[in-house]
Amino acid sequence: YQLIQFFHSGKKNKEPVFKALQLAKDKAAIYPYLIQYSIIANDKTLLAEYAQKLYAASPLTPNVYEYQYNTLMSANTNAVIYARGIGDLVGLAMVQQATNIRKDITLKYYEEGMDLEPNAYLCLSLGREVIAKYPNAYYTGLLVSLNPAGDFTELSNHISNDFKKERLDYAVA
């Protein structure tokens, strides 16, 4: 019930999610929602705490870790990455906060009609309908950049210099 209240608040009311944590037998099951709340509320302390707790309780598989790592590496310095799901936003926060990867990046919860910050990137998981609203966007690896005047240089640099490819190499071997 508490999580439903949290969802109905647009994931902006902290009382129901903290009540759900208090009542839960499996605290780690509530951590993803606390991570989402902390990103929406821009609470970096809470984000670090619960991303690290979730990572300790339920580490990402090597394939998922590499995907999330490469997603973070698809952005330039001091980027803002917009996502909105448990599968993308929470995984990115876990890798970033628990392993200190790309702490220069700000993670944001994407909402329709919001003003996007400069140096903005969208997660592919936002879907075609959202990405299509930005006709000048371009792929940078596992993200879409909204920065003007992009070309394939950024994509090429990320793939050649920044990406981990161990799991990909393993998959084709």
Q: Predicted segment positions?
A:
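Short His-Asn-centered micro-motif
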Residues: Y82-I86
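A short acidic (Asp/Glu
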Residues: L89-Q97
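ER/secretory pathway lumenal C-terminal domains and tails of membrane proteins involved
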Residues: Y1-N70, S74-T77, Q97-A173
